[in-house]
Amino acid sequence: MGVYTFVCRNNGGEWTAKQHSGEIEASAATPYELQRRLVAAASAADSRYGVQSSFSMVTPSSAVFQVIVGAVGGGAMMVSGGGGGGAAASGGAAAEAPKEEKKEEEKEESDDDMGFSLFD
């Protein structure tokens, strides 16, 4: 799986993008066309796998765009659409799942406890 992160800027009506830690660059007149070009460039290495992307505006003239090649389909992977934090490209150890807190079951109150019944 490959993760490509791009910093996008709008200068004088033209959108440009540079890969955060790499050599891929692209430019286009609209953010949509820029995204299409970046997805094509990132998936050129291996187009057999699925591609997932996320475009987040930071300011009216800048954005962050992330392309994940080889993403698992069917909603098994989630990509943040507007928050911070990037995905790690290395296969590090998975974080431990938080321990579930024990919840005490609340007893349902019956009609008898209130002194009346539905059928009285």
From Swiss-Prot:
Role this protein plays: Plays an important role in the elongation step of protein synthesis.
Family from the record: Belongs to the eukaryotic ribosomal protein P1/P2 family.
Changes after translation: Phosphorylated.
Pfam families recorded: Ribosomal_60s (PF00428)
GO cellular component terms, A-Z: cytosolic large ribosomal subunit
Protein name, per record: Large ribosomal subunit protein P3
A GO MF label: protein-containing complex binding
Coiled-coil regions listed: none
Key words of the record: Phosphoprotein, Ribonucleoprotein, Ribosomal protein
GO BP, one annotated term: translational elongation
Region of interest (Disordered), residue spans: 83-120
Domain of life: Eukaryota
InterPro entries linked: Ribosomal_P1/P2 (IPR027534), RPP3 (IPR044252)
